[in-house]
């Protein structure tokens, strides 16, 4: 990938630049907890974005997206926003840095990625983090890492129109090889936890169902509103920290649907902490058990699964897979699977054939390894 970028850069700009990279991410457990002030447990992965960049002495950005074979040129003022969707990410990062007082000028760049698009692995956050990190480095801006993550998040909010949380950008910037990060979405404190499945005889693999169910209304916002209603009745800002005893005490004051949503979130909060404890003991069986619990909680209580993802989780269980669950917001996308190495090939074969027989296409198999986040590539 780096070689192809370098060749295109040389052809377009007749020069060489510096290389920067950032990563996509997985979230092992802790789904729909971020907007409830809870914990998430992401890690950066060995798939991401690479960009070559050199300053060009103008106030223009000349950018080429290698995978799309598209070129864009734009200025750095608010009114200079490019038309191409992908270019808005780079423009947004530039604008967010400028808004924070960063003094930057034009540059030439070529980028490419191997994060599968639409698989819930945060290709957009990887792109934002690559450029935020690169511009901070090239212009010696001294921006702290949390602010680099916020620059990516603000880019989504203000230039892409996606009201995302901080987890994706956080994982992309702070990712560390062989570690997951437990992020407290209320205090923004975080802690690294060693996670090396290979060393313990396991593999981590995503199965992309390649299904995305278009939904009527805004189910994401509906789930969030349910949680906020219950938190308010409990007299809390967030559901974080609420107990099942407290929830059961107000059961007759809330709808059955709101009760189910809150039950899932309270359970998920505990599952994240259980998984952290289990990893400390090298107990991957407990990690896997909690993953299955999360899947069926998301399916039955939070109702964000779909038939195809439930089927993949069932196939995983039948094949003796240690843990499997929906990853991401739901309604399609991937399952994340923790599989014993000796069962891996048989599981993948079974998942592909069984899924294809039932739904007419194979799931896409994406093995992942926990890796470093944003960095300079030598």
Where are the language model's segments positioned?
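FabD-like malonyl-/acyl-CoA
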Residues: 125-126, 334-338
């Amino acid at each position: 990938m780096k070689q192809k970028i370098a060749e295109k850069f040389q052809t377009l700009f007749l020069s060489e630049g510096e290389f920067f990279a950032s990563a996509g991410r997985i979230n092992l457990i802790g789904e729909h907890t971020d907007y409830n002030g809870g914990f998430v447990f992401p890690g950066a992965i060995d798939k991401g974005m690479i960009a070559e960049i050199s300053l060009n002495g103008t106030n223009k950005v000349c950018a080429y997206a290698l995978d799309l074979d598209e070129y864009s040129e734009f200025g750095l003022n608010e009114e200079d926003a490019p038309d191409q969707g992908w270019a808005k990410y780079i423009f947004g990062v530039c604008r967010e840095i400028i808004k924070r007082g960063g003094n930057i000028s034009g540059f030439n760049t070529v980028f490419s990625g191997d994060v599968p698009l639409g698989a819930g692995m945060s290709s957009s956050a990887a792109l934002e983090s690559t450029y935020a990190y690169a511009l901070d480095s090239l212009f010696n801006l001294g921006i702290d890492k949390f602010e680099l993550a916020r620059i990516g998040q603000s880019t989504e909010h203000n230039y892409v129109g996606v009201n995302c949380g901080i987890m994706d950008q956080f994982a992309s910037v702070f990712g560390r090889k062989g570690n997951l990060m437990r992020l407290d979405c209320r205090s923004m404190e975080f802690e690294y936890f060693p996670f090396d499945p290979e060393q313990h005889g396991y593999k981590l693999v995503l199965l992309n169902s390649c299904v995305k169910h278009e939904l009527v209304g805004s189910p994401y916002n509906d789930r969030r509103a349910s949680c906020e209603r219950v938190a308010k009745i409990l007299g809390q800002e967030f559901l974080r920290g609420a107990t099942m005893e407290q929830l059961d005490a107000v059961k007759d004051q809330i709808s059955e649907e709101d009760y189910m949503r809150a039950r899932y979130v309270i359970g998920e909060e505990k599952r994240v902490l259980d998984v952290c404890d289990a990893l400390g003991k090298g107990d991957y069986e407990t990690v896997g058990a909690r993953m299955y619990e999360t899947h069926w909680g998301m399916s039955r209580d939070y109702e964000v699964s779909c038939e195809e993802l439930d089927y993949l989780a069932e196939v995983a269980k039948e094949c003796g897979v240690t843990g499997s669950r929906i990853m991401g917001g739901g309604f399609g996308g991937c399952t994340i699977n923790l599989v014993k190495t000796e069962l891996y090939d048989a599981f993948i074969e079974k998942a592909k054939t069984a899924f294809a027989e039932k739904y007419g296409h194979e799931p896409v198999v994406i093995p992942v390894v926990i890796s470093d986040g944003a960095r300079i590539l030598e």
